[in-house]
Amino acid sequence: MRYKCVLMDIDDTLFDFMPGNRKAIALLMEELGLSSPTIFDEYQAINHACWQALERGEMDTGTLHVERFRRFLSEKQLDDDPERVADRFAQLLGQQVIPLPYAEETVKALSERLPVILLTNGITVIQKRRMAASPIRHWISGMVISQEVGCSKPDPNIFEIALNGVDPRDALMIGDGTGSDVLGANRAGVDVCWYNPKGKALPDGLHVEYEIQDLRQCLAIATQQ
């Protein structure tokens, strides 16, 4: 076959992240005594800025895990311990497992032909809890989490770790994130199958070998001769 292994993103590729994130934040804010209708958007603005800093290499995942809540609590003039709040959020989000359409059947089908390695910038405790609650765990050959290995997508080093000796030219990255999955794979010399269900435009300077709107389409791509 053309490829010897598949790398797959998790959030917004296999799991529908935002609904679970919204629910976890709503539960957390209720515990903090905050009930403004704009509270999620206020938190999300801070969270997004931290994730952008991570993709620029200015912050690691462990720092992000706490820093977003440190900034949020400061903005709200709350004296709660940001580490405690971050850990509670991780517990709540770890309970939210919402697979995207065809995610489970696609990973299962891929795993019958190729090793499937999950590659994520997520928080270790969150991703491990979510994966433990998903049948996807039975079909993957491994999971590389940025917080555990000390580098994050789009750093090509995390791709090298995930490949574990496989030539980058023999691997396929399947993911939705242009600033993480696509850019990182481009830098690492790995072909990209861009999962783009909303038909977004590809940012200038990036390239993909394949573009799909339905996860099932990646099976024929990954297993081509």
Language model regions located:
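Asp-based, Mg2+/Mn2+-dependent phosphohydrolase catalytic module
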Residues: 1-6, 80, 108, 117, ...
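N-terminal helical cap/lid subdomain that shapes the substrate entry/recognition surface
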Residues: 2-101
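Alpha-helix termini
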Residues: 22, 29, 46, 70, ...
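Charge-rich, acidic-biased intrinsically disordered regions
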Residues: 36, 119-120
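A generic structural signal for short
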Residues: 57, 95, 116, 169-170
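Catalytic-core regions built around general acid/base machinery
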Residues: 102-113
